[in-house]
Each structure stands twice: as C-alpha cells, then as structure tokens.
C-alpha cells in the first residue's frame, strides 16, 4: 500500500484504556484516518464525555457496533473487546474485506482446546482461527506482513517473551528452569471499578495474584515451545504494584553452559534483535526501569549472569498499555500495510 494513502481505521471497544491509547496513537498517525469508534454501554456518548482531556482533538461519537457500518467505513479494524467477543465479530469483518487486529486473547492460540480450557469460552470459528497470526513483530514479522487477522499478545506475555526468546531459540538454557517474576501497574486491570484497584487498597502495597493459574501462562508456553522445538513449561507469577502503568518482568533460568558471561549474552541478544526497532538491549550493567518505557512502544532489556548459581537473569520493561497492548497493535498494522514499523509510535518516554 502506498505510503501516501490515508487508510480508514476503526476501533471497536474504544472506551477502555486500550481503546483510549489506540485513539491517541491513531489520531496522530501520519497515514491513518480514524473513521469509527464503537462500543456497547458507551454507544451514543461523545468520546470527550468518556475522556474529557481529548475533547479539543476528538469530536467523534461512540457508535453502536454495526458490522455493515464498520466495513463500509474502515479498511482496518481494531477490536478492543473483552475476551470471548472478538471471535464473533472477526470472521464477519474479514468476510467483508477488513483487516482485523484483535487485542483480546481470542486469536492468540493455535490450539483452541487450550483457549477454551483457560478462558471457559466455546469456539466455533476454527477456520478463522486457523488464519490468525500471532502479533509479536520481533518473532513473526513476515507472517504479520501477509496477515488478514492478527491476535495481539498479552502484556505480561510480551515482556516475558522478549526476555526469553533468544534463550530458547538459541538453546542457551535448561528449558525446565525458566521462572518469570512480573509486576504490573494497575491500568492492566482495566477501567472498570474493582476493589483491589482502589487507591486505598493498592497504594503502598505489593501482592501476587493468579499464582500458578494466570491465563497468560499457556500463551507464554505456546510460543516458548515453538522457539525451543519441544514442550515447555514455565513458572509465571504476576504481581500488582501501585503505579498506573508499566511492567517489569524478571526472568531466571539455568544456563546450559556455565562458562557464558554477560558480554556473551549481550552479543547474542543484540544480534537477535538487530532488526527490531522497538527493542533496546541495554549495555553492560544497566538494568531497565518501567519509567523509561512509559508512553513508548519500546521494550528495554537488561542482562546479568550469576556465576554463583549458574543462572542468567533478564529484566524486561515495557509500558503495558503500549508495547503490551495498543502500541504493539499499531506496530502490527504498520507491518501489515507495508509502512515504516514505528510510524505513529512514540520513541521517547514521559519523563520523569
């Protein structure tokens, strides 16, 4: 597609934090025209009523979800709906000729039995699921380029996989030893009122949740298994921390070769991500902070080796709402349409 063409884009599920980030990114994208905002409970409301701070730029009304209307106005559609809803809409939008990017979990799994077991949702869209491409550009850029439907990864998954991918792909670790300790800001829980996300509950507190049962676990394992060409199980524990946005995932694993040093791994990671404009491999002894990634589509990776234990430690920092969600979806759209991969994506953080 010509870089001079403006492509018409719509967002279904524009009222949540992910939808809001899409509105922000797409309204500033040089090659996009935002032509539709859709929702259920928010239908009929001016978007500025939901987010008053964008009223000077966004004059659109949130409309009911009507597939014929969407297809008539939009060449590309982002689905920012709760799990279990995109699988009803995506097949119909694809039939109508739209390119679709789904931010939910519906099209992340090639094995629908795994999805149904973890998300408790029956699926009848096997043919559509078969054409879905996993939306992690650093691993599947060529597939995304040819895709009609992209299932965008989860936020924890993105941070974890970018830390783990070189280790599994290059066979650098004992595969059964991978442990992921991840921490996320409260925006990962969405915009709906939840007791654990109240300021009085979350502030000045830190706690684990979804221990040994978080839904992102099988998603991480699916991709790690492909990279390692064997069945992989990981230990993944997420934590909620009292800040609005950001994820720090710290990965631990036992090295196959205890003689590897930090410089070796930095060389391997730098080579692995040499064509990845949204991944920054940090130099010797520099470890990432979530604030560095805030408001950007970047992932910062820091690497260390503990020779006492024979383990590699990889730290991965992202903005959960951007590289972990909406920014990565826009990155995938850019690739699908043959544009510069970073078009419309901020490269410098909100700082401090």
Swiss-Prot record:
GO terms for biological process: L-arginine biosynthetic process. It is an enzyme of class 1 (oxidoreductase). Pfam families: Semialdhyde_dh, Semialdhyde_dhC_1. CDD domains: AGPR_1_C (cd23934), AGPR_1_N (cd17895). It comes from the Bacteria. The active site is at 155. Its EC number is 1.2.1.38. GO terms for cellular component: cytoplasm. It is found in: Cytoplasm. GO terms for molecular function: N-acetyl-gamma-glutamyl-phosphate reductase activity; NAD binding; NADP+ binding. Keywords: Amino-acid biosynthesis, Arginine biosynthesis, Cytoplasm, NADP, Oxidoreductase. SMART domains: Semialdhyde_dh. Pathway: Amino-acid biosynthesis; L-arginine biosynthesis; N(2)-acetyl-L-ornithine from L-glutamate: step 3/4. It catalyses: N-acetyl-L-glutamate 5-semialdehyde + phosphate + NADP(+) = N-acetyl-L-glutamyl 5-phosphate + NADPH + H(+). Catalyzes the NADPH-dependent reduction of N-acetyl-5-glutamyl phosphate to yield N-acetyl-L-glutamate 5-semialdehyde. PANTHER family: N-ACETYL-GAMMA-GLUTAMYL-PHOSPHATE REDUCTASE, CHLOROPLASTIC-RELATED, N-ACETYL-GAMMA-GLUTAMYL-PHOSPHATE REDUCTASE, CHLOROPLASTIC-RELATED-RELATED. NCBIfam families: argC. Belongs to the NAGSA dehydrogenase family. Type 1 subfamily. This is N-acetyl-gamma-glutamyl-phosphate reductase. It comes from Picosynechococcus sp. (strain ATCC 27264 / PCC 7002 / PR-6) (Agmenellum quadruplicatum).
